[in-house]
């Protein structure tokens, strides 16, 4: 005679299965993933990033931005790096959100060096992640132990870029919701925006705060400086007209960004909102007061970002050329 089934036992078994499945999926990323398949991989990437930084310091900033733009859209899967091809992929780089991004050609330089050592082994997604890690360290930021084992996407997500990556004119509520969608909490979001301590903002992205009248929340003296940097309300997008995010330490990831926005010297409207919104202001104040705390939270935030929904296991592929899908 068949034994009666216990509904609660079935539910418990299902929950156990789901928990194990989730755990196994998350564990496919690991520290030193290439220790056996390509033991020199991380050293080669670090060496290439350092050499490029010594020649072109702004490359380190590009690697940090690449990580953000890649991971915010679906997954940390190097979909950002794909080039447009006729009747095929449309590059995410064609989106207006990618305006001002550069140095992609040097990703190919890093990839070529790794391929020479270990062909078809190290993913472009891991190169994006590790180059950001090494770039952060070169820019005076924290040293971060990062997991690897990501695989590369077989498609571009250009239609999802606009809905995934916050715009400089977005409200702080929308920005927080975009990060929350990928499980990045408020404190980590405030820390990630500290990446604005390096690099620059193009005039096309800040003139709305200057013309026809100056944004009342902007420090008047700083506004005059910005108007000298951006003397027209209609700058040519192709012209390299910009202002540094941080005038004091423009190429160091430090807490000066938070000190600046507390003085109403942030370049973007989201910077001003970050300093004044009650959900974020306490973290801004704390980071402005304590650079070590900022670095700790920045490290945590970068890890959360870099481990967003990775493609791993037997999914995706390991691209031979980061710009194009592998030929079938």
What annotation goes with each model-predicted range?
Residues 2-328:
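Catalytic cores of secreted/periplasmic or lumenal enzymes
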């Amino acid at each position: 005679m068949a034994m009666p089934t216990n509904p609660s036992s079935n539910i418990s078994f299902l929950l156990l299965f789901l928990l194990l499945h989730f755990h196994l999926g998350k564990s496919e990323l690991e520290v030193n993933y290439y220790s056996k398949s390509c033991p020199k991989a991380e050293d080669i990437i670090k060496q290439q990033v350092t050499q490029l930084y010594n020649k072109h310091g702004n490359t380190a900033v590009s690697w940090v931005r690449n990580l953000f733009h890649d991971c915010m859209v679906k997954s940390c899967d190097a979909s950002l790096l794909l080039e447009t091809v006729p009747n095929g992929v449309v590059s995410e780089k064609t989106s207006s959100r990618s305006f001002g991004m550069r140095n992609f050609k040097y990703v190919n330089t890093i990839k070529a060096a790794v391929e020479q050592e270990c062909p078809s082994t190290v993913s472009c997604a891991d190169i994006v992640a590790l180059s950001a890690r090494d770039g952060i360290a070169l820019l005076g930021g924290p040293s971060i132990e990062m997991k690897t084992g990501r695989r590369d996407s077989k498609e571009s997500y250009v239609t999802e870029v606009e809905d995934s990556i916050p715009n400089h004119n977005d409200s702080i509520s929308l920005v927080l919701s975009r990060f929350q969608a990928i499980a990045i909490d408020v404190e980590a979001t405030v820390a990630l925006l500290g990446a604005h301590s390096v690099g620059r903002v193009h005039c096309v992205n800040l003139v709305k705060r200057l013309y026809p009248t100056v944004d009342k929340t902007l420090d008047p003296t700083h506004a005059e400086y910005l108007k000298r940097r951006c003397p027209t309300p209609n700058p040519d997008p192709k012209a390299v007209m910009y202002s540094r995010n941080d005038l004091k330490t423009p190429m160091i990831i430090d807490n000066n960004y938070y000190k600046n926005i507390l003085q109403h010297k942030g370049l973007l409207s989201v910077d001003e909102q970050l300093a004044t919104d009650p959900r974020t202001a306490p973290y801004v104040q704390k980071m402005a007061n304590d650079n070590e705390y900022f670095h700790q939270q920045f490290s945590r935030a970068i890890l959360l970002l870099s481990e967003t929904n990775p493609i791993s296991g037997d999914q995706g592929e390991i691209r031979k050329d980061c710009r194009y899908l592998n030929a079938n």
